[in-house]
Amino acid sequence: LIKRPEQLAACFAGGADYLFQPDKQFAEFDSGDRTFQCARRIDVLKLWVAWKAHGDAGFAARIDHAMAIADYTRQRIAASDGAFVSIVSGSFTNVVFAWVPPELRPLAALHPADLDDQVRTQLHHLPPQIKARMQAEGTGMIGFQPVHGMNTFRMICMSTTLQTTDIDALLDAIDQYGNEI
């Protein structure tokens, strides 16, 4: 479409490692960092259109649903007997967590910066492998990004169709694939 495709990255790339992981499957096909839509420039238009379409009450209901699903996800992680650990605490629609192999449970530290290098390295390599397996088998799609040098899962709970059963299935798949690695 353009004479010099490299100019797209030069103009729009923010280099956000939390969005565009080089170690994910099919990274070479991810055009996100080469598009106008990736930058924050367009977000205000998307927000305005969504608000106009749903109105105040509809927009509030969407946010309440997203928060409820995120809270449910955090509750499932907390009740997982150490299979999952929350990496970033807080009350918002993003849930950042790690899967922990049985031999490392319970973790001596919950923050990546406090883990010993060997454990952090072991945990770092798991999310890309688990995500690739989920993609290959079509069981789910979840992002991951580094937090203090360790890849972690990042669940963004914004879809109005997302239900607690979807969260259960996703966490069960992560646990299953992690145990099979």
Where do the language-model regions lie?
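Active-site C-terminal subdomain of aminotransferase-like
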Residues: 1-80
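Short, hydrophobic beta-strand segments
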Residues: 49-50, 96-99, 153-158
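PLP-dependent enzyme catalytic core of the Aspartate aminotransferase-like
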Residues: 107, 115-116, 147-181
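A generic structural motif
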Residues: 53-57, 103, 159-163
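Short beta-strand
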Residues: 85-90, 142-147
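Generic recognition of stable, solvent-exposed alpha-helical segments in well-folded globular domains
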Residues: 42, 61-68, 72, 90, ...
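Generic non-transmembrane alpha-helical segments
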Residues: 72, 76-80, 126-138, 173-181
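Conserved PLP-binding catalytic core of the aspartate aminotransferase-like
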Residues: 86-134
